[in-house]
Amino acid sequence: MLFDSFTLGGLKLSNRMVMAPMTRSRCVENNAPNALVAEHYAQRAGAGLIVTEGTSPSPNGLGYARIPGLYSPEQVAGWKLVADAVHAKGGKIFAQLMHTGRVSHALNMPAGAEVVGPTDVACPGDMYTDAKGPQPHSAPRAMNEADIAKTVEEFATASKNAVAAGLDGVELHGANGYLIEQFLNANVNTRTDGYGGSAEGRNRFAIEVAKACVAAVGKEKVGIRLSPHGAFNATGPFAGVDEQYVALAAELGKLGLAYVHIVDHSSMGAPPVSHELKQNIRK
C-alpha cells in the first residue's frame, strides 16, 4: 500500500510516502536556496511528496540563521532550481511556509526586519546566532491589526511565489510554536482583542492565512501542519485544546485544503494526540 500511487487534490503522487520538513540552515546568501539545496531535494525525489524545510514568507519570519525565504526574486529563482531538480527526477514538492514569530533573534534577521508575535513576551530559552552563538530569544513587538493583515498577505504572496517557482504547493506551518501556533495557543496568546481571548479569536489568524493562500493559489495546492498538544518552543496543552482544534479543523475543512498534517509531541513529554481527536479533525 505504501508504494501505491495516490492523488492529493489534483496532484498524482507516485507513492504514499511523504518526506517531512526538516530545517537545514544551508541558505547562506540572502536566504535563497542554491545548487546544494537543489541537489539535496533531488536526491530524495523518490518520496511521493517532499515537504521542504521551513521557508519564511517575510523578512520578519527569518528567526533562525540561514533559513530560506520566499519573498524576493532571488529566493524565487533559488526555489525554481529546487523545483526543476525534483521534477526532473519525477518527484513532487510543497514548500513549507514558516513564519518564526517570537522564536527568533534579531541577529539572524536582515536589516529592517523585526521580531514580532501575538504579544511582547519573549520565547523562553536561547536561539543560535552565527554572530554570537546562543543568545536569549529577542523580545517581540506585539502585532497590531495592520501587522496581522500585512502578514496574512505575505503568506498569500509567498504561496504565489512558490507556484511561480514551479513548486507544487505549500504547507502552512501551524505547529511547533511558530507564529501561527503562537496565535492558536492560549499559553502564548493572551490578547484580548479579536485575535485572542477565546478559541474563536485564537483560531482567527490561522483561518485568515489559510483563506488568503487558497484564494492565491487554489485549495488543492494548500495544506497545513498542526500540533494540538505541542510542547515545542514553550507552547504546551491548555484547557479546551481539543475542542478548539476540532472547531479549527471544521473551518479549514470548509476551504477544502489538500491535507492536514498532525504532529504528535509525545516523545517530548506532551500528551499524545488521541485517536478520537484525529478522527474528529478528519471529519
Regions of interest found by a model, annotated:
Residues 1-283:
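Flavin-dependent oxidoreductase catalytic cores
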